[in-house]
Amino acid sequence: MGGSVIRRLFRTKSIEQILADADHPDHRLKKTLTAWDLTALGIGAIIGTGIFVLIGTAIVGDAHRPGAGPGIILSFVLSGLTCAFAALCYAEFSTMIPVAGSAYTYSYATLGEFLAWITGWNLILEYGVACVAVAIGWSGYFNNLLRLAGIELPHWATHPPGGPDGGVANFPAAIIVLLVTIILVIGIKESARATGIIVCLKLVVILFFIAVGTPAVNPDNWTPFMPQGFAGVGAAAAIVFFAYIGFDAISTTAEEA
């Protein structure tokens, strides 16, 4: 009996069965995404808070890890190579199994139902926590912009209950989550268009920083190149790795491309 239970836990679903289930008329997804849409979705997922927030910490370091200094370039190369190998795996899987589900579906086809179940719930937890963290971070930036404009939101409207000063809810964070949810519910094509607009804004910001910062480059600041040695470069690589993640979001849209 024990062997039967184990077999059921680790039973796999064939690729043919997965494709047949996805092609069922009752829950078949429309193929509306183009190569540009997928590219925009991928860039939008990758160029997130990581590239804007984590670089300073990776360069300088903190009390718990050394900084990379100018060697941050090597940290980006190491993290980029690691993510490239993972992205190639996702590309291979998404072409073999072009259905929604991403890592959950791939796990179901290769590792079994139980491990796929764990993977699926991990993905839900990952996206849920990431959504909350990004929404709170966006709320902080939004509040700072309002202060620069001379507008101060009440404390109770920007802080959750249970804090030292008390609050009702972080309404800016809740509102941005609601707006994004509405766009997603309207349709994937509309979501892709909204993502394309946001991607263009992100690229403009990055190009602006490059254009403004390039004239201020001072080669003297590149010495020493690795003040903390390879320990600093490795520690920074673990941080800037998060500036690359997000490419897996493309594989979730394979069924609609």
Regions found by a protein language model. Give the residues of each.
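Extracellular loop-to-transmembrane helix junctions
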Residues: 53-161
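Membrane-interface "cap" regions at the ends of multi-pass membrane proteins
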Residues: 1-56, 60-69, 73, 84, ...
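Select transmembrane alpha-helical segments in multipass membrane proteins
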Residues: 31-42, 112-125, 172-176, 228-240
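Structural signature of transmembrane alpha-helix termini at the membrane-water interface
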Residues: 84-91, 132-135, 139-149, 182-189, ...
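Hydrophobic/aromatic residues within transmembrane alpha-helices of membrane transport systems
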Residues: 34, 48, 93, 112, ...
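Membrane-water interface regions at transmembrane-helix termini and the short interhelical loops
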Residues: 29, 92-95, 118, 122, ...
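Lipid-exposed faces of alpha-helical membrane segments in multi-pass integral membrane proteins
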Residues: 43, 47, 74, 78-82, ...
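Helix-loop-helix junctions that connect adjacent transmembrane segments
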Residues: 14, 20, 24-30, 69-73, ...
